[in-house]
Regions:
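N-terminal signal-anchor/first transmembrane helix of integral membrane proteins
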Residues: 1-102, 152, 158-161, 165-168
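Alpha-helical transmembrane segments and their membrane-interface junctions
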Residues: 28, 96-120, 196-202, 206-207
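Membrane interfacial helix motifs at helix-loop boundaries and amphipathic/re-entrant anchors
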Residues: 28-44, 112-142
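Perimembrane helix-loop junctions in membrane proteins
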Residues: 63-67, 116-127, 162-173
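Helix-boundary and loop/linker segments of multi-pass membrane transporters
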Residues: 81-85, 132-133, 184-185
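Hydrophobic alpha-helical transmembrane segments of multi-pass membrane proteins
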Residues: 144-149
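Conserved signal-transmission helix
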Residues: 157-192
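Histidine-centered phosphotransfer motif of kinases
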Residues: 184-212
Length: 212
């Protein structure tokens, strides 16, 4: 049970949920403009993803909200350097939007369903069900099910969006090569410093022995 509930004690569970909710601000604004075409935001994010600097912003958000506190989260914060990176960013925005819609649906309707089940168990009519079920106390036994579904959805969608971000916002081949070259240069520099230090110590010891 403790392992099952452990995600509730992790800050990443809530920051990932917040990350999923951020694009819903755009969707909510659009629904006020034209609720008959809710699919328009999915089209608008495609050209946005082709802008080079968008990849930097998405990478920073992923680092701060999907894997906060980790030194090597695996997300690139460099602007898109090729059309492949731009396309990956556009696909990422679509995936983030889709997962955000799923998270919003679960976060809105599962608590509403719990409220409706409680009303039915107390003898009040349903506000949500289309078939108008008769009130009965036994509906109280069903109230944990939507909460468990919400819990599983929040945790599962958080892991899913993190995995998608690592795939679509991860370093490109050119960035990995540049990082490898940088690490190689640092190792060579450390080796050179160690060699010079060794030679200096050896020279000092030789001088000390000769003087003795």
């Amino acid at each position: 049970m403790a392992r099952f509930l452990s995600p509730l004690r992790r800050g990443t569970t809530y920051t990932r949920l917040l990350h999923l909710w951020v694009p819903m601000l755009v969707v909510s604004l659009w629904m006020f403009i034209d609720p008959r075409r809710p699919w328009v935001p999915a089209l608008l994010v495609i050209p946005v993803g082709l802008i080079a600097g968008v990849r930097t912003g998405e990478g920073v958000q992923a680092r701060w909200m999907l894997t906060p506190g980790k030194e090597a989260p695996g997300f690139s914060i460099a602007p898109s350097g090729s059309w492949r990176d731009r396309l990956r960013t556009a696909v990422w925005l679509e995936a983030r939007l889709l997962l955000g819609v799923a998270a919003m649906f679960m976060c809105v309707w599962m608590p509403s369903l719990v409220y409706d089940l409680v009303r039915l168990s107390l003898g009040y009519p349903s506000d949500l069900a289309a078939w108008h079920p008769s009130p009965h106390w036994s509906y109280a036994l069903l109230t944990p099910l939507p909460l468990l579904a919400l819990y599983g959805a929040v945790v599962g969608l958080g892991h899913l969006v993190t995995a998608a971000a690592r795939t679509l916002l991860g370093p490109s081949a050119a960035e990995r090569l540049a990082a490898l070259e940088e690490r190689t240069e640092r190792l060579l520099e450390r080796t050179r410093i160690a060699r010079e230090l060794h030679d200096s110590i050896g020279h000092a010891l030789t001088v000390a022995v000769v003087q003795a």
